[in-house]
């Protein structure tokens, strides 16, 4: 009897998904119509970015990549799915850490409340107090480059060290010591390993199952590894009587927590937000700086142009203030172009409202998972001329190379956009300005640029291999 029941269950599911499903009119691989597991079978190389580009070129701007999942690469999809007036809501992806909650939650009221508290740490006044501390880590990075004396360095690891050290300080007043000790912290290595499974884009029910099994097998996981690392530093921050003397991203979150009635306090929210600060604040900066240095080494003419733009903006001591460079056209163009080609969060899923959603005169049924691939959009000839080429001028002197600027949203848009954008841009501008004013950069001997790009992995954040560069001090 059980066999007949299962045969009927799976048989009817198969017929429904192949013939009667509301998404059947959208093109896509046949196996993807049958099961969401199709997607993870295609991502053994953790290359969702490449797959999304291939699928959009083969099937068009609306591609069914799961039984109830649609990938969109139409430029109007960004505003429709993520914009301020979008009726779309967060999907099951945001249940991954249940029952723990934080700013990355499906609960819109909780998210709105947490976002208001978070925003206090990212205002203009706060950024001005952070700048000297960011500058200190920039100069520590410059010291590491100078110590190499023109010998090859792995810029991907140095950018990672800079980003995590800076976020440890600004987020929690903590010293992670990665730049000082010239090594990757073991907790960061564990984070990278833990994020690798995200690159397979497993269905959420399977991800939850694996997490529950892992927690059952390793019950100490919450006190060891990256989670334990974050909790340890949060506990130290909470116990520090002098924490109010140095502004930090965590301070307004903790202040809000302590003002609540004891019965209303939820330490898990604070812990989740702590982890989110460290991860989100570090990955974007580290990856974007790595790719920016890659393209500048590949296209040295832009280094010359940047120096011509930046040298007149230096202070008497040869350093830069963010106020002087924040609107430097070519510097911002280099950053924007890097983010176009390698967006930090390429696939952010949403669920259409029950009444459905219209994108560019195309109706998408209700309660379907949709996302817009920033990676595929960034390389679409329908949106950018010479889309595969690194041309920063499209963001300043050559706006004709952008056919539809509304598709560009590396930090997302709307009320779920990245609050840390101003801080991330400040870090990137200062690193690039200070480094390029002191060093000539080039690929290390034997470095293969194509191999480097082919072995970049998309694990919801970028996992980047060794970027061998030489930095030679300018005479």
Swiss-Prot record:
Family: Belongs to the cytochrome P450 family.
Residues reported in the UniProt entry to bind heme: 418
Name of the protein this chain belongs to: Cytochrome P450 monooxygenase sthD
SUPFAM superfamilies registered for this protein in UniProt: Cytochrome P450 (SSF48264)
Gene3D superfamilies referenced in this protein's UniProt entry, alphabetically: Cytochrome P450
UniProt-listed Pfam families: p450
Residues carrying a glycan: 336
Recorded topology in the membrane: Single-pass membrane protein
Membrane-spanning parts: 276-296
GO molecular function: heme binding; iron ion binding; monooxygenase activity; oxidoreductase activity, acting on paired donors, with incorporation or reduction of molecular oxygen
Source species of the chain: Phaeosphaeria nodorum (strain SN15 / ATCC MYA-4574 / FGSC 10173)
Catalytic activity: betaenone A + NADPH + O2 + H(+) = stemphyloxin II + NADP(+) + H2O; betaenone C + NADPH + O2 + H(+) = stemphyloxin I + NADP(+) + H2O
Alphabetic keyword roster: Glycoprotein, Heme, Iron, Membrane, Metal-binding, Monooxygenase, Oxidoreductase, Signal, Transmembrane, Transmembrane helix
EC identifiers of the protein: 1.-.-.-
């Amino acid at each position: 009897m059980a066999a007949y029941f299962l045969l009927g269950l799976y048989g009817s599911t198969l017929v429904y998904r192949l013939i009667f499903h509301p998404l059947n009119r959208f093109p896509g691989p046949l196996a993807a119509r049958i099961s969401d597991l199709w997607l993870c079978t295609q991502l053994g190389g953790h290359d969702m970015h490449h797959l999304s580009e291939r699928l959009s070129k083969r099937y068009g701007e609306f591609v069914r990549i799961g039984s109830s999942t649609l990938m969109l690469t139409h430029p109007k999809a960004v505003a429709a799915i993520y914009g301020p007036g979008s009726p779309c809501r967060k999907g099951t992806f945001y249940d991954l850490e249940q029952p723990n909650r934080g700013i990355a939650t499906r609960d819109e009221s909780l998210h709105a409340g947490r976002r208001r508290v978070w925003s206090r740490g990212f205002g203009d006044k706060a950024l001005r107090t952070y700048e000297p501390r960011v500058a200190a880590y920039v100069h520590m990075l410059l010291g590491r480059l100078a110590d190499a004396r023109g010998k090859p360095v792995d810029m991907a690891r140095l950018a990672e060290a800079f980003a995590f050290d800076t976020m440890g300080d600004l987020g929690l007043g903590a010293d992670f010591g990665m730049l000082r000790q010239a090594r990757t912290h073991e907790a960061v290595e564990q984070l990278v390993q833990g994020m690798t499974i995200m690159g397979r884009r497993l269905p959420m029910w399977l991800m939850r199952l694996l997490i529950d099994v892992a927690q059952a097998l390793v019950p100490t996981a919450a006190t060891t590894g990256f989670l334990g690392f974050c909790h340890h530093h949060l506990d130290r921050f909470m116990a520090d009587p002098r924490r109010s003397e140095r502004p930090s991203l965590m301070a307004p979150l903790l202040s809000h927590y302590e003002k609540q009635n004891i019965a209303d306090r939820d330490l898990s929210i604070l812990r989740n937000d702590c982890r989110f600060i460290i991860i989100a604040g570090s990955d974007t900066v580290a990856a974007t700086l790595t790719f920016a240095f890659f393209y500048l080494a590949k296209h040295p003419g832009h280094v010359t142009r940047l120096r011509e733009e930046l040298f007149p903006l230096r202070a008497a001591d040869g350093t830069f203030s963010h106020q002087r460079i924040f609107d430097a056209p070519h510097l911002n163009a280099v950053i924007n172009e890097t983010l176009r080609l390698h967006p930090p969060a390429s696939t952010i899923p949403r669920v259409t409202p029950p009444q459905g959603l219209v994108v560019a005169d195309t109706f998408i049924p209700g309660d379907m998972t949709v996302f817009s691939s920033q990676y595929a959009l960034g390389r679409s000839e329908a949106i950018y001329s010479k889309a595969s080429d690194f041309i920063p001028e499209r963001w300043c002197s050559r706006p004709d190379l952008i056919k539809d600027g509304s598709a560009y949203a590396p930090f997302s848009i709307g009320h779920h956009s990245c609050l840390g954008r101003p801080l991330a841009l400040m870090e990137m501008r200062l690193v690039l300005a200070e480094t390029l004013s002191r060093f000539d950069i080039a690929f290390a001997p034997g470095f293969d640029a194509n191999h480097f790009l082919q072995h970049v992995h998309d694990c919801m954040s970028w996992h980047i291999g060794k970027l061998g560069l030489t930095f030679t001090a300018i005479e």
